[in-house]
């Protein structure tokens, strides 16, 4: 069925995946809190990323760098001087927009050009398109726009007791720079030889002009980033490797093949530090959106930090005896965006065979489902024995225990939150020590010994 964003958001709020931030005080624009099921889903996704990109990789190691860094870091990286978005205001509604996203939304949704990208356009080119197309503010309905101007995305705060320029620091806008400044520490302490990578998961902050689309674009967000260092000249080979690796990770976790596409950046769209970038985009209900950027950052970052810090970042190649600054490939994935993608991809409303009823179901891969199973006693009289099954399984998996309402309603509730297996403990279970296991997707039921449940679920959640 065609999915709409409102249905996904409504389910996410209703079933405890995501709540509006600070809701009892009227909320705070574009802030979201992950509820009990949302935090399990997101943690499972992060663990799946860490498992494949760090733990099981012969190349990569992990890091957890501080959010607050010496401000010189952001001078060296270019964020203080160049980290800007094109801003435009509608004079009638007084609402501010990112000019490039305003144009993209119009061209993709109104003109039907799904592949239109505004990145790389100059301010004059963007203003010309807005004027020539007569793009209107969706709130006021007018085309009464200001000129386009720059807007710095860094969140500024102060360290210490006085709020002056000497104590000015910033919330990091990306996790990558924490990796670059620790490059030598990691390389030396772990005795790593090229090629190798450093990955981390952490919060970043960007004062976005027009955040929106639920958790797709927020000012506080979490990144899963890998900086992979290689010999200059080998960067395109490794970029292709990580493109394939990242795409396979998504498909293996259940994302549908026709829901994603790979899009190479045009030359005029590339960031100043990149000689090649490919985005893995997902087809959200609101249109195609960037999910994963795989960029060849060349030696830009290490060169900049070498120049600003005075440290030598050259690598001594033991095979060729050469010294050079490594090139870097960066696969950067937004944890919140990919969580939204998994929610959208899993969401379905479908008819029930042999019935006029419909059910809402989240078809999560078992590896990322918030609960791997739910134990359901057929009657509350059986709860004392059924809880023993729950306790046995919860030693290895996240498991729900639900004894309220009819068994049919409990099945539907578990379908809505994406639980792959419902385990019904009935009166026969007292005698034969077997339970009925219901599959979420097929709704088929099989009888199984309680002693085999651990092995059964372990096999199903393997990734």
UniProtKB/Swiss-Prot annotation:
The UniProt annotation places ATP binding at 206-208, 216-221, 290-291, 334-337
PROSITE patterns the UniProt entry points to: AA_TRNA_LIGASE_II (PS50862)
GO cellular component terms attached to this protein's record: cytoplasm
The protein's matches in SUPFAM superfamilies, at most eight in alphabetical order, are given as:
Class II aaRS ABD-related, Class II aaRS and biotin synthetases
Q: Which GO terms describe its biological process?
A: glycyl-tRNA aminoacylation
Q: Where in the cell is it found?
A: Cytoplasm
**What would be an example GO MF term here?**
ATP binding
Q: What is this protein called?
A: Glycine--tRNA ligase
Q: Which source organism does the UniProt entry give?
A: Staphylococcus carnosus (strain TM300)
